[in-house]
Amino acid sequence: MKSAALLLPLYAAAFAAAAFHHEHAQAVIQEQQLTIVEPDEYLIELSPGETRWVTENEKWELRKKNINFFDITHNAELGTLKRRINAASVEYPSKPVFNETLAPLLKELDKNNMRAHLETFTSFHTRYYKSQYGVQSSAWLLDQVKKTLADAGASKASVKAFPHPWGQSSIIATIPGKSDKTIVIGAHQDSINLFFPAFLAAPGADDDGSGTVTILEALRVLLKSDEILKGEADNTIEFHWYSAEEGGLLGSQAIFQSYEKEARDVKAMLQQDMTGYVQKTLDAGEPESVGVITDFVDPGLTEFIKKIITVYCDIPYVLTKCGYACSDHASASKAGYPSAFVIESDFKYSDNKIHTTEDKIEYLSFDHMLQHARMTLALAYELAFAEFK
């Protein structure tokens, strides 16, 4: 996800360890890195129309300074094609209406499932998108999604890897409805250690292991609905796990560029990036809440999500901002699709251990992640049966 303030002592310790174990570090580099032909410089977009050529090291330095961007080196066409559907024309329900139907489903959400998945997901040395570990973690995640569909008997549903030239694939699970109008639920699967991405550990428990397992659990329970399972929902639902978010929203850009070219009719996209950290909120004396992002998002979809949280979650929301290109919903927006983003807290209280070796499970609240899962499940179900024009 976006860069949080990284702690200098963590860098110093990492540098000392790297220097002391130089030979071991070289071995890790050789094991992790894939053979990938990379350009000398990358074209990044820091705000609409503001572009710059930078080296890879300069990309990471920008991230350390909390500066986000699209890497548009290979995705310059995203957002340039005319689409048949105007995102501004999408109208969302005036209020949630499936309270009674969702009540028993919400009870099926299990934080123990999220913990078990996250324990394995964070056991990979890193999920850096250009590493062999990143390839392995993506393959493991694909297997978990396949198992989720198989266990549910979801014969109409499917899942596929969306390959990328850097090695780590994105993943797309599709639950067909009665129309091609599509609701997308997303999270990113990669992690990064911004000090030495190629070889330092990046457990990525919160960023974005938490979002990854949150939407996986929402998918599992959504498939307990007979109507969803039988393809009787009005709209198609997709769950996306993006590769290479940390490199400049690369995986989501590739997917939404392909959707734009195919004139795919995406009615809504919700990103879940960092769903588990609450300690800074509590330390500040503030009530536990979820953070609804209000900048660079679709206002209509965001307003409906606020209603979803009010009805289906046990904690309130706060309104907050995260800036341009701060997570994968920005790729959907750039393609002309209405998107939204809900994070774990007010942005100023979000996890500052991300992108380091300290982004660990022990700092997360699975009760809080359960609230994100409730919101995700409820939104997916409500919009699956929404009547869009």
Swiss-Prot record:
Cofactor comment text: Binds 2 Zn(2+) ions per subunit.
Keywords: Aminopeptidase, Disulfide bond, Glycoprotein, Hydrolase, Metal-binding, Protease, Secreted, Signal, Zinc, Zymogen
Record lineage: Eukaryota, Fungi, Dikarya, Ascomycota, Pezizomycotina
Propeptide: 19-89
Cofactor(s) listed: Zn(2+)
Subcellular location per the Swiss-Prot or TrEMBL entry: Secreted
Protein name in the entry: Leucine aminopeptidase 1
Main location (coarse class): secreted
Example of a GO cellular component annotation carried by this entry: extracellular region
Family statement: Belongs to the peptidase M28 family. M28E subfamily.
GO molecular function terms noted in the UniProt entry: aminopeptidase activity; metal ion binding; metalloexopeptidase activity
GO biological processes: proteolysis
Residues making up the signal peptide according to the UniProt record: 1-18
Annotated binding of Zn(2+) 1, by residue: H188, D207, D273
Organism this protein belongs to: Pyrenophora teres f. teres (strain 0-1) (Barley net blotch fungus)
Disulfide bonds: C322-C326
Binding site for Zn(2+) 2: D207, E246, H355
Record's function text: Extracellular aminopeptidase that allows assimilation of proteinaceous substrates.
EC code(s) of this entry: 3.4.11.-
Glycosylated residues in this chain: N99
